[in-house]
């Protein structure tokens, strides 16, 4: 279902290596023509050192042709440079096998002090640090993400504060951990990178905006795979003004992921009101079945529309790389939202009518409601004789009302800040693309 596919938008804010898993997913789902996807992969690979992979893709594209000489020659060059860099960095890498030095790495965070120790005891020269960074990035470009992560860790341990490559090294380390699916370590690197970005007082407004936008997109890999991720994405995006502003200004399509996280997170039900306000405000710039489902249900109280959007949501979820694993949780919670909202309005409703709204048989609907009541997920009771469900009435606590009013003030402040940001953007004529050594890639063949 290419209509709602976001890969082309996401790719603009991802390192090219992070785009590969998305393309593999699209290939399995058969959303696009396979030939076009293979051409896209080959284009992606053109600026990497994964020559063997590029050869395989080329053979898939052109099975009757010989592999181009340029690829064969590039492979020879890559192997030679890899050996050269390995030889140049061997002395500094071997230092991390020294127990005394390893103990110092664990006990101090002063890279300059550690490097002075290496200069005194192992005759390591300052220029070797740049070579170590180059070797780490070369390993990454070859697709050796475990090697890249290890050498970037070494580099960051030794790099002095303010080193020009430190920020790039953090991006590279995060990308490597994501591609190895080390979600706990990736979350640590994500938080570390966020702290560095937010503490950079010398960065301009536009640079910070772009870096936050990149961080939001990269974080999706972590948030939709880590056990705590669906809580963390809500805290990052909905309740940190600078990140909400980044979404409103640069990437409103991220609302799909925020909305899914809220719907599938039973403990965060109170944030629905704030989320719906954001969705309403941004509906003129972005909407899809997932955001429209909440609009139908909580803004328009259009239950037929919500039911229709829920069916569309299932297709969107199954064809979204980040959300496919959320499908069952989403459908279950979305049905509960429809049920609660409908019963809250009507107080008493026939099970047969409810079954129709939930796209179930009356027997399935009754069993579903009984299970909700039994598991204490719902304050309601069933009148078996009349075939009715009667909802209980719960008044919100004073404490909860105070919290919601406070959040409303915070939200209004965020909206005001976002409007100012947009006005500044229009006055400046838009944003220039920003890219570091870990560059984004725009897969144009997926543009709708």
Swiss-Prot record:
Keyword Nucleotide-binding in annotation: no
Claim: Glycoprotein is one of the keywords in the record: no
GO cellular component, one term: eukaryotic 48S preinitiation complex
A molecular function (GO) term: translation initiation factor activity
Ranges of residues in domain PCI: 225-396
SUPFAM superfamilies hit by this protein: Winged helix' DNA-binding domain
Matches recorded under Pfam families: eIF3_N, EIF3E_C, PCI
Protein's GO biological process: formation of cytoplasmic translation initiation complex; translational initiation
Key words of the record: Cytoplasm, Initiation factor, Protein biosynthesis
Compartments in which it is found: Cytoplasm
Known function: Component of the eukaryotic translation initiation factor 3 (eIF-3) complex, which is involved in protein synthesis of a specialized repertoire of mRNAs and, together with other initiation factors, stimulates binding of mRNA and methionyl-tRNAi to the 40S ribosome. The eIF-3 complex specifically targets and initiates translation of a subset of mRNAs involved in cell proliferation.
Family to which this protein belongs: Belongs to the eIF-3 subunit E family.
PANTHER family: EUKARYOTIC TRANSLATION INITIATION FACTOR 3 SUBUNIT E
Quaternary structure, from the entry: Component of the eukaryotic translation initiation factor 3 (eIF-3) complex.
Name this protein carries in UniProt: Eukaryotic translation initiation factor 3 subunit E
